[in-house]
């Protein structure tokens, strides 16, 4: 059975507060064994990273400022999953 393990990092915890995804990482498993198929990207959230999120992942506003926006990687991400 094929499965995808997905991990994200965000600017904060609440969508209600406008927080957004800054990193997506995925690996494909086949019968619980990792395949060589992976997807990874950093994203420009177009907003400030909260102090609490920065303490978790360490991605600064400066680091994320030149990354692609989600709309630019959405098709590739959806094709992977």
Model segments located where?
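Conserved non-catalytic scaffold segment of RNase H-like nuclease domains
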Residues: 1-81
């Amino acid at each position: 059975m094929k499965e995808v393990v997905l991990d994200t990092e965000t600017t904060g915890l609440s969508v209600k507060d406008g927080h957004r995804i800054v990193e997506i990482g995925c690996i494909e498993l086949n019968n619980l064994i990792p395949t060589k198929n992976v997807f990874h990207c950093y994203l420009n959230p177009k907003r400030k990273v909260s102090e609490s999120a920065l303490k978790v992942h360490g991605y600064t506003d400066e680091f994320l400022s030149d990354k692609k926006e989600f709309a630019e990687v959405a098709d590739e991400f959806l094709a992977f999953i």
